[in-house]
Amino acid sequence: MSTGGGAVSDDMLEAAIGARARSLQSEIRWRVLIGHNLPEDAFAAYRDNAPHGVVVERSRPDFRQLLANCRLSISQGGYNTVMEVLAARTPAVCIPYAGGLESEQTLRCRLLAAGGAMEIVEQGSVDAAHVAAAVDRALSAGPAPVSGLDLGG
């Protein structure tokens, strides 16, 4: 799981970390990458309180390599992350940030979910149960289909 900058990711973090115990993937290690815009005290709380099997770290320069080798990506659906997920053909769950006047992540994730490229957990459904179900669906569907998706900008 990755948070981009991390400044507005608390709902996603709590739901996704809680989803591990409810998912069919509860026996494997989950890695959580939190951006540097989340204050250090909040980051330390996530790191120090993470359940067994969940590794919480700051964002890393080898993110693309991690993404290419992971089973699944959970993110807010930022442009860069989505493009990297599609390029890596990594199964994905999007939990878009939709606070304030933000709508681009939701629109992007809805369109890609409609095309079968990822699962989406909408703003009003962000909890551990919904995220776990989306994780299990994404993994059972396999890698995102890229044929039919216009990746040319």
Locate each region found by the language model.
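Anion (oxyanion) recognition and catalysis
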Residues: 24, 86, 113-114
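Structural signal for conserved beta-strand scaffold positions within catalytic alpha/beta enzyme cores
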Residues: 58, 94, 120-122
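A donor-sugar binding/catalytic signature common to diverse glycosyltransferases
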Residues: 61-105
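C-terminal amphipathic helix plus adjacent low-complexity
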Residues: 133, 137-153
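Donor-nucleotide binding loops and adjacent catalytic segments primarily
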Residues: 1-72, 106, 124-125
